[in-house]
Amino acid sequence: MSKLALRAASLAPTTFDADANTIEAVISTGADVQRAGYIERLPIGNADLRGIAGAPVLDAHRQDGVQRVLGVIEKAWKAGGEIRALIKLSSREDVAGIVRDIADGILRNLSIGYRVKTWADSTSSKGERVRTALAWSIHEASFVPIGADAGAVTRSIP
């Protein structure tokens, strides 16, 4: 079993639907991320989105209890070189403040938890080690204070 890795993205509240309690987010742009000792690449075209519907949306990747579940990914798709997701947020009282912060634009960043099935290693023109995911899948998304994929944003027009 491969190790669950984490990568971040951000979202804007413009697609928040209060009636449905949903928000649309770009959860990955495939941007390079500097890791310890290498550059990580998650090409969007190599992502397997089968089975992502129903994946949990967590509080900062915390998996220590069901109270950490803030919502669920209803669907995800590739478009314009991005992975986008429709997230259904919980209506539980204990997460109402978090949902309000999402709607108000206070909480904007998302991070994905993913597994890489196959890596390819190479060296950049600058001599840096590069690890490219040839096959990878998303297993959860989390709201986080700071994200690594700075180019990922929520779409203003769904």
Language-model features, listed with the residues they occupy:
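Polar/acidic, low-complexity leader/linker segments enriched in S/T/G and N/D
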Residues: 1-53
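Residue microenvironments linked to proteolytic maturation
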Residues: 8-17, 22-25, 56, 74-158
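Generic secondary-structure boundary/loop-capping signal
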Residues: 30, 36-39, 46, 55, ...
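Short, charged/polar surface micro-motifs in flexible loops or helix N-caps
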Residues: 31-32, 63-65, 91-93, 118
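Acidic Ser/Thr/Pro-rich low-complexity disordered segments
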Residues: 37-39, 64-66, 123-129
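Short conserved beta-strand and strand-loop elements enriched in small hydrophobics
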Residues: 53-64, 110
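A surface-exposed loop-and-adjacent beta-strand signature within N-terminal beta-sandwich domains
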Residues: 61-76
